[in-house]
């Protein structure tokens, strides 16, 4: 399987612009399967726009090496891709620890035995770009850095000087350089980039990135590197449990401006277990569709709180669905939506607590949670991994630890100690998780949906 990892020396070097532009440029003549290292939901939305193919996340905190390879294989085979292009996260070696590479781009590159292209912010650099390249190559000899892309060069003269330095002093080929251009930058908000689903200008912007790549990057050289990818180790582990719900169920999934943070394989795990996904909009539709369960992902409900609050028929239908004991699983923004209010505006009110946006990040971490109560997705006395990233908080005014399904071993959750409000058959948590972390997710949730029809 032909592939490449596009990584950077750090955050803010232009990885997403360059990676998405490369995906767009190559998609004109080839089938591209995009991937994103780490738990991010937003960058994959740009990949989807560039390629017309759902991007998949690869994460070594969530996945074993065998699961990383399986997830990569799933993506490549399901889309019949010619090339797999993997956008890294932060700097190449950044992970959860200063001394190992769990959660890093380097861990994904090694699990997939993939060639790597290093993106360098070349502002005011010439020979130092060569030094950076040498340092990144020297830290781990198992990382195969096959090329460099120079971003933010001042001029053609600057590019040629820096290219010569990297190729002669670091013995690494330079595939091209991108000059500074503020017109191609992306809008941002408190959780980072704005999802492509919200940006009306995204199609034109992605097209512009593709043109920029065609004009400045040696795509033939890049494809040659991918064509010569070394074999992937033939050791795979399943992403979800082979146990399969025999009964057919229907599961509602909101997907609109407010809610759009979902991992592709979470939805596939539900479909594997005979669930039919019914997409709907809590903003635009009048009520919940006729379903057996509800899965509310994250997003930006705080940005669209007025629209959500005005849709009273939808709020009432979801509250009644919970009161009727049908299973609901909600993550982060979904948790806020199920609270009494968001910033004082009425919401679903399954949980009688107020949620609000704050000016400071409240939780930004990989998480480890211990399950203390059975719930629609997990059984008591298990432990699972996830992540949290939120500027919001929920003002929990109760005093009973049994209100929660999870106790936090790593991360903040709702109270600093607990997460996963559980009422009726409704579970709502700040934790985002991936089916690789809990292989029985699809089976448990669909089984609960069937048993509580």
Curated annotation (Swiss-Prot):
GO terms for biological process: cobalamin biosynthetic process; methanogenesis. This is Cobyrinate a,c-diamide synthase. It comes from the Archaea. The gene is cbiA. It catalyses: cob(II)yrinate + 2 L-glutamine + 2 ATP + 2 H2O = cob(II)yrinate a,c diamide + 2 L-glutamate + 2 ADP + 2 phosphate + 2 H(+); Ni-sirohydrochlorin + 2 L-glutamine + 2 ATP + 2 H2O = Ni-sirohydrochlorin a,c-diamide + 2 L-glutamate + 2 ADP + 2 phosphate + 2 H(+). Belongs to the CobB/CbiA family. Keywords: ATP-binding, Cobalamin biosynthesis, Glutamine amidotransferase, Ligase, Magnesium, Methanogenesis, Nucleotide-binding. The active site is at 332 (nucleophile).
């Amino acid at each position: 399987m032909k592939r490449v990892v596009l990584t950077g020396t750090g955050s803010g070097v232009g990885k997403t612009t360059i990676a998405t532009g490369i995906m767009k440029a190559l998609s004109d003549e080839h089938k591209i399967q995009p991937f994103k290292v780490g738990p991010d939901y937003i960058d994959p939305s740009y990949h989807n726009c560039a390629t017309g193919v759902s991007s998949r996340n690869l994460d070594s905190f969530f996945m074993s090496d065998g699961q990383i390879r399986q997830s990569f294989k799933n993506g490549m085979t399901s889309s019949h891709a010619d090339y797999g292009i993997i956008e890294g996260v932060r700097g190449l070696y950044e992970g959860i620890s200063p001394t190992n590479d769990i959660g890093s781009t380097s861990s994904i590159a090694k699990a997939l035995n993939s060639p790597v292209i290093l993106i360098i912010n070349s502002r005011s650099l010439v020979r130092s770009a060569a030094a950076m390249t040498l340092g990144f190559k020297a830290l781990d000899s198992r990382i195969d850095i096959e090329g460099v892309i120079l971003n933010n060069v001042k001029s053609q003269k600057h590019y040629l000087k820096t290219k010569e330095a990297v190729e002669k002093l670091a013995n690494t080929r330079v595939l091209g350089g991108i000059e500074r251009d503020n017109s191609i930058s992306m809008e941002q908000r408190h959780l980072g980039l704005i999802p492509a689903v919200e940006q009306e200008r995204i199609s034109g912007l992605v097209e512009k990135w593709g043109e920029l790549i065609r004009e400045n990057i040696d795509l033939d050289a890049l494809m040659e590197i991918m064509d010569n990818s070394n074999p992937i180790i033939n050791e795979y582990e399943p992403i979800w449990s082979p146990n399969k719900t025999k009964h057919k169920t229907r599961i509602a999934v909101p997907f609109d401006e407010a809610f759009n943070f979902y991992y592709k394989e979470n939805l596939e795990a539900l479909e594997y277990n005979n669930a039919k996904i019914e997409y709907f909009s809590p903003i635009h539709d009048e009520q919940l569709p006729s379903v057996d369960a509800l899965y509310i992902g994250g997003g930006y409900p705080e940005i669209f709180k007025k629209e959500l609050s005005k849709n009273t028929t939808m709020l009432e239908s979801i509250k009644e669905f919970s009161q009727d004991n049908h299973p609901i699983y909600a993550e982060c923004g979904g948790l806020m939506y199920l609270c009494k209010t968001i910033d004082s505006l009425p919401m679903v009110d399954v949980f009688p607590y107020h949620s609000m946006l704050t000016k400071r990040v409240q939780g930004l971490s990989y998480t480890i949670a211990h399950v203390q109560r059975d719930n629609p997705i997990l059984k008591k006395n298990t432990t699972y991994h996830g992540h949290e990233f939120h500027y919001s908080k929920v003002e929990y005014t109760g005093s009973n630890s049994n209100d929660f399904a999870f106790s936090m071993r790593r991360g903040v959750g709702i109270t600093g100690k607990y997460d996963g409000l559980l009422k009726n058959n409704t579970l709502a948590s700040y934790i985002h998780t991936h089916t690789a972390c809990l292989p029985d997710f699809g089976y448990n949730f669909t089984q609960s949906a069937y048993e509580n029809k």
